[in-house]
Amino acid sequence: MAVHRSLLNKPTWCRVAFWWWMLVMVMRIQGTNGKEQDSVIKLPTQEVDAESDEVGTRWAVLVAGSNGYGNYRHQADVCHAYQLLIKGGVKEENIVVFMYDDIATHELNPRPGVIINNPQGPDVYAGVPKDYTGESVTSHNFFAVLLGDKSKVKGGSGKVINSKPEDRIFVYYSDHGGPGVLGMPNMPYLYAMDFIDVLKKKHASGGYKEMVIYVEACESGSIFEGIMPKDLNIYVTTASNAQENSWGTYCPGMYPPPPPEYITCLGDLYSVAWMEDSESHNLKKESVEQQYQSVKQRTSNFEAYAMGSHVMQYGDANMTAEKLYLYHGFDPATVNFPPHNGRLKSKMEVVNQRDAELLFMWQVYQRSNHLPEKKTDILKQIEEIVKHRKHLDGSVELIGVLLYGPEKASSVLRSVRTTGLPLVDDWTCLKSMVRVYETHCGSLTQYGMKHMRAFANICNSGVSETSMEKACVAACGGYHAGLLHPSNTGYSA
């Protein structure tokens, strides 16, 4: 296009106005010649496409199911998710946040009052509402909030998901897990069948149009495997299948590393994968399926499954064609971002969720050289943790021997059911067996959650509660759990 020479002699503001006018005219010409082309660069304030944004109200429940500075990453994940939704236009009044809220001001936090979820990331803590913190972070409150039942909430802000039939709900959970369970900082744990029953009840009440659930936890697939209906208008992805660990990342001593002053992991592999994906794409263009495929690849650590996991899908597969903005909202700053791109193609070093605690403790120990008394105390704590882990592993194995004999014990306890079958046939039995075990052998802890499959298999094989109790007494007689007895920690079932 020729530009008249006289224009070059005009003041700067005139030249800017001319080019602005030309840009508008090009856009109008594109619009009159049919459907607007994706190649046209749009302004953040422009409509992305003709698709209506009338989607009812977007709601979200964000849950960090742990506490303690060693579990920094779970609250960081949830705070990051909150900021992403806010940028997408989801209203604060429609987002319910569960987090213990003990890491931002923790004495070990090198940036007091700040939480980050990426080594170069911004503070994600500022502005996050403290709906349910401390002792109010419970599975009971989570269920009450999701059902919109204020009368059942105990403590906290009282905010609930008061959704209507035309509304959409996004649920995100990050913490430790085990076969059939998700952790909570206050006992009991969240059991899979209880969660599914709540989802069924929410659906029966007509309390939403569609729901998307993301779950970050070890063995998170077991929460839905064989028990998640396909007709609830709910789509689920999980960080792992029913028998895998999930992974912490951005950890000290690993690549990519956190800032050198941090002694704990900043995020979780599946969680940072979906959030960093959402932040780098136009969510009015990217579908649920496209994000699933991207997150699946990254969470597998690009098919390095020894240091990654299989992201799984459950529920209503018909929802995968929907655009993500229906749940995460739309950030106008991403208007010119592609629906998918090749960002973050490199592998990441990770740590097993259950070993992240020991990694953190070891970092504290190594950085306490100038404080010999503290170093001795930390070493003692590490030894106690390892001792209890060995006790948990050994006692469960011995219980199996007492119930099934030495030849069959290991195969029965570790047996994994065929894909499509639930972990256990009788969930009440599972809870009973866990309580019997913890009474005599001590709290399972976030590490011992991995033994839930053994207790489920004990139920599936028809062992009575009386026989289980006798085996637990024989296996754990004389063991003193101390602070790890359920009288101090609470029962996980």
Swiss-Prot record:
GO terms for molecular function: cysteine-type endopeptidase activity. The keyword Transport does not apply. Pfam families: Legum_prodom (PF20985), Peptidase_C13 (PF01650). The record marks 265 as: Required for post-translational maturation and enzyme activity. One of its GO terms (biological process) is proteolysis involved in protein catabolic process. Disulfide bonds join 251-265, 429-459, 441-476. Keywords: Disulfide bond, Glycoprotein, Hydrolase, Protease, Signal, Thiol protease, Zymogen. Residues 35-53 form a propeptide. It is an enzyme of class 3 (hydrolase). Belongs to the peptidase C13 family. This is Vacuolar-processing enzyme.
